[in-house]
Amino acid sequence: MTDIAATLNHAGVPCWEYGLTAVDAYCGHVMKSPIGFYLVEGSIVDLARNFENLEYPSLPYADASLGTEAGDLEARFLCVENLSERSLGSLALTDFRRNPLDGRFHDPRDLYPLLKDRIFDPGSEGGENALFETALYLSRLQSAPAMSIKVPPPPTSAAPLWQKDLLSLILQGERSAAAFDFLKDSGFIKKYWTDLDALLLVDHAKDCHPEGGGWSHTMEALGYRKSRDLTVSLAILLHDIGKPHSASSEGRRFDRHAEIGARLAARFLRSLGFSSRITDDVAFMIRWHMLPAALPRIPISRVSDVVLDSRFIDLLEVFRCDEFSTFKGPDVYYASCAAYKAFMRNNRNPYRDQEGRKKAEIYSRL
């Protein structure tokens, strides 16, 4: 039971997890940066009595919300008169719920057979928040065989928190690419996330990127993640958004795209309300995502401030996904890791400089 559920239970306010939170619990999916959906039998007044820093976003799934100021878990609260109410969202799967006190699931729409096989089949369902809900479930579950998903048009307006939740939750799913392709087909990406949409205009050379253009490459890279860490996933998603705005120079087709992309990514994340820490970390990884490939060939001491940064380990994961998505094999990545490990070993050795030379030999030449 989460601290939020425990707080409400102690106050005598009944609550259940529902929708994606209940589905994740059933499937054993754990998010590193969780956003919990809670069904509350009470009012926002009851919530305000128990939580400081409560906000009221007036979203289809959130009468009230808590950010990370309250702890590691963000929460979105939907207030109802009775916990047994149905039609909580636009899709039947959103009615799936779990009692956090005893861990029991409640399935008023008889969806267990599909969930058991990790299948998502919305049929012809639709509604105000259908695009949001469909994208989230597509990031977790497999589409039913031969199913044609109804693609709703993008909303006429999309609040920053709604977009931030959508992006954060999709990226913490195993099937992120399926959800992003769905959003692309709906026109949402083109309307709201234009920097991502511009990747469709990036045409890669087939010998370097047999997986396809900018969009296909990015979706392929997401599939190589070892974890669903939100910050690393954001960096992978946005690592090439500078390419549509870069120019060829001295044999480099997308010259300075990393620097451009870092600025665009920071602007995008700030506009959605991501924390300064996440924004800065993502911008750092995008700015330097080309560096690991050069480590075996350059004096690493020249870029020691970057390599010694605590975020460089995460940067190597971004590089691995970027490199593996091109089907080149692991050789370049392993060579970069070997160079990095050698540098770090020498950096800790008091008898050698950062390039591995014995310091006594260096001093003898002076």
Q: What do the predicted segments below correspond to?
A:
Residues 1-366:
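Catalytic cores of the polymerase beta-like nucleotidyltransferase superfamily
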